[in-house]
Structures are given as structure tokens and as C-alpha cells.
Amino acid sequence: MTERFDTAFHPFVIPFLAGMAFVLAVCLIKAAIVVRELDKADRRKWILSLIHPNIIIKNGIDIILDCLIHVRLWKRNRLLGFMHSSIAFGWFMIILLGHLQVLIYCPERLSTFYYPIFFDYFIEGGQYTWISRMLDAFLLLVLAGISLAVIKRIWSRLFGMRRTTRPTFYNLIGLYSLWAIFPLRFLAEQCARAGDLSVAPWWAYSISLCTFMVVLPFGRYLHIPAEMLLITFRNAGLEIKKPHKGMARVQADSCPNCGVCIDACPMNADPANLKDSTVYLTRQLRRGNAERVREISDKCMLCGKCTQVCQVGVDGPKLRILARAARKYRINPDFSNAGTGGGVRAVNKVLYFSGCMTALTPRIGLSVESVLKKAGIDYEWMDRDGGLCCGRPLHTAGRLKEAAGLVRRNEELIVGSGAAVLLVSCPICYREFKERYRLPGIRIVHYTDYFCELMEKGLLNFEKSDVCYVFHDPCELGRGCGIYDTPRRLISKAASIAEAPKNREESICCGGSLGSLSLDFRRREKITQASLENLYGSKADAIVTACPLCLSTFARYSDRPVKDLAQIVDEQTKPI
């Protein structure tokens, strides 16, 4: 193996060097801006995490699994996962092996930055080594991924995607230059190995690299470096606190524009809502288009399905809530009319909080009370005759300060009751209690978990019916709080159960969500019908859910019975 030229330089390396210098400079500046936008405590927390051994290891593992192998996409669609991982992992291995090749065979050139990229032009005989054969194998892997990407542009359904994003001008330039890089590299290397030292293919290869790197910071491919930064932020325990800065900015930059969230979004039962998916929210956040950010943020139902399917984990609901919170309001409630009384006394008892929506569907509260009596539980019903809201509607509307005031007042009442357990029947309230309340010494539990515990202790005597139910996973209970199994265990004890085609994490929102500020009833009805059609696919006799909002929404449109799980448990149990 010998060098072909006395000097290890040719002008065709200049575009590559210019592109690399540009992308490194811009990305470092963008990263510095993001870090500076963090508050002082978060910035210190992040810096300390970078020297913590366990977090360093976790960062490395997560970057490999999420940025190179794309494990989440593999779980969603194997062909889609292979396409992304073959390009990302294959390119990474080409870079790694290229540097290893220089280190082994011409270590004196290791400091020449571009040498591993154009190795076959400067070195003769390099194709006969084992490392060269590995490089060829990974290049073929990348070319296979590029071929699939071209097919996906034509036939996205093959990859499990009915809809894809509309590419911007910058994204198209980045896409086509990325597609050109690897065929041009293959052509240039084959020419050099055949003894043809024509520089035309090397110029084309270098220019395509330069084009991709120049476009990268301004389009979808910014997600490549941004996602790595996001992983370190997330593993440091940082959360989104500002609507367009810091963690919010890096989440928006990390969106790969893959479009998986478009099919997942339940609002897209109406095609008019396609442009309001999270992928377009992040695009408008990057552009600084405040008007479109407001429109997209207000329409969303905050069901969380986009976050569930996102390969990066972009928190669409949180980004929208903070965008809503950035607005100024003229009315500032203080809840002074709530009084200062001690509230319900439930010392060492179960304190049942039914919530506003259960007040509108009283059969749920009565069923919960009946089951508690059958099991012999000592309880008090906190808001039997009315009470304060949990605060979640204010929180999702972006009224964070007002919601916090309501939370503090409720905390006083609940802690002052002396209760040992706070039992909640509304998953909307349950999530707010779990995430935002400080109730020392009080266990917060949803009735599905609590009833399951009573069943396991032998305090509930079930009689099984011959009705077959399909369970609708409420957004807040399932994706919001991770409760999927206990409702199904209760149903299977009381009756037979069937599953809808899309269930658990993939469950479709009922359409009645309190999260949307602007979605009208006509468009909500389409979402509800789509959710019901999914449930009808189970061929079950009746529908059961564990959310008063889902119950009231489905009951208006369903052609078969709809019940809350508390009703089923009450109907199918008798006193011990």
C-alpha cells in the first residue's frame, strides 16, 4: 500500500473542508445559545451530569440506540427502522473505520482531517485490506438504506405510513444531497481502484458533502446533532420550562420531520387538521412563526399520542401548553371565594375525590361509593356536594400560575383532612394529583388500581357475566399515567374482554378532551367516530372505559352500550 502523490492534497477537498467548518461552527453556536437559555440551576445540573460516570454511560447507550440504531422505529415498522438505521449506523461505521484505516496504514496522515474521507484517491492498493472490505460492506448497507428512502418517497404505505410531511426547500436540498453522497463515493472509489484518477467524481462527492453540511443547520437534518444534545439534557433530568428557549428549543430542533406523528394524531380523522400535527408545530417553532404556533397549540387535544410514537420523544403537549402560557390574560382569579375552612375530616381513612367531570356523570361516583361499601372500606367523599377543580383544565390552558394557586388550596384541604389514601375516579384529576400535588404521607391512587388491590385481598366477590367488553384506554390514564393492566384484570374478572385493533399506547382519543381550546364539535365528532370504529373492530358487545369524559362522549354517538369500569365492578360484585 503506497501513497500515489508526494503531497496529500487536492483542491477537491476544499468544499468538504468548508462545509465541515461551517456546520461545526453553526452547530456549536446553536448549542451554546441553547445552554445559555437554560436557567442557572438546570445549566449546573447538566454540566455536573456530563462528569457523572453512570450518566455518561447512559448517554452513550441512548445515543447508540436512538440516534444510530433507531430502536423505536424498529418497534413500529421493521422496514422503516432498517431504512433509518442502515443510513445512520452505516455512515457512522464508515467514518469510524475510515479513521481506523488511516491509523493502521498511514498514521502520519491521521492529523490530515480529510484523509479518511478521500483515502482511495491518495492511497494505492487500499482495496485489498480487510478494513477496506468492511468499508465496502457498510457502504452497500447505506446504499440499501438510500434505495429504501427513495422507495418511501413514492410508496410510504410500504413503511407503515399513510401520510408523510411536506418537505421544505432546505429539506429537499438536504435530502437530495444526502442521497447523492454515497453513490458518488462508490463511483469515485471504484474509478480510483481501477486506476482512473479522474477527479470529477471526487469533486462531485466533495460538493455533495459540502451541500449537505451547509443545509444541515437550517432544515430537518439539524436533528442529528440536536438529538444527541437532547439525550444529555433528558438524562440530566431537565424539563421544558420556557416556551421557545432552552429545552423547548432543542426539542423542536430534534424533530426529524419523519411524519410518524401525522398518522398517529387523532385530529387527522379530519384531513383539514393534517397541518396541525406536532411535526408542523416544531417546524413553526424553528421559524419563529408565533401566529401558526398559537393556532396549532390551541387546536391540539393534548392526548399525548404524538409523544408516544415519536422516535425522539418530542413532548408535543408540553410544548403546546407552554406556548399557551406565554399569552397575557386580563383576568387573574385568586380563588378567595373558596373559603378557609378545614374541609372534610378523614383521619386515616380513604378520601374519595370524584372531580368535576364525575359530578356531570354521577353514576360513576355512586358506583365507586357502592364498591367501597361492599369491601368494607372506611372512606369520606370529599366533593360529594361540590368542591374545587383539580386544576388540570387551567394547567392545560396555559394558566399555570392560576392552576398552581388552585393546587395549593386543594393541598391544604386534602392534607388537612388527615387522610391516608386519596382515591380518584377521574384520570384527568389523577394525573394532575400525581404530577403537581405535594401530599406528604398520602397515597394517591386511581380506583382501577385500588379496586384491583381489593380484589386480590379477597374483599370483592365477583360474579362473571356473559357480556363481552372492549376497554377504551383513556389518554390521561394510559399514555398519561401508564395504567393499562389493572382495568383489564378487573374486566376479565367481571366479564369477558376483547381488544380493539389500536389499544393501550396506540389508543385513539375519544374526541371529548378538555385539552383543545379551539377544536369545534363538528371536527370532534369525526374524531369520536374514528375512535368508536376502532373499538367496534373488537366485535365486543359493549364498550367500557375508566374516564367520565370518555363515557359521556362515547354515549352520545355509540350504537352499543357504554359504561364506566366502576359500574361494571359494582354490577358484578356483591357484599362479602
Annotate each language-model stretch with its function.
Residues A236-G259, S277-L302, A530:
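Ferredoxin-like iron-sulfur electron-transfer modules
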Residues L302-G304, Q308:
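EF-hand and EF-hand-like Ca2+-sensor regions
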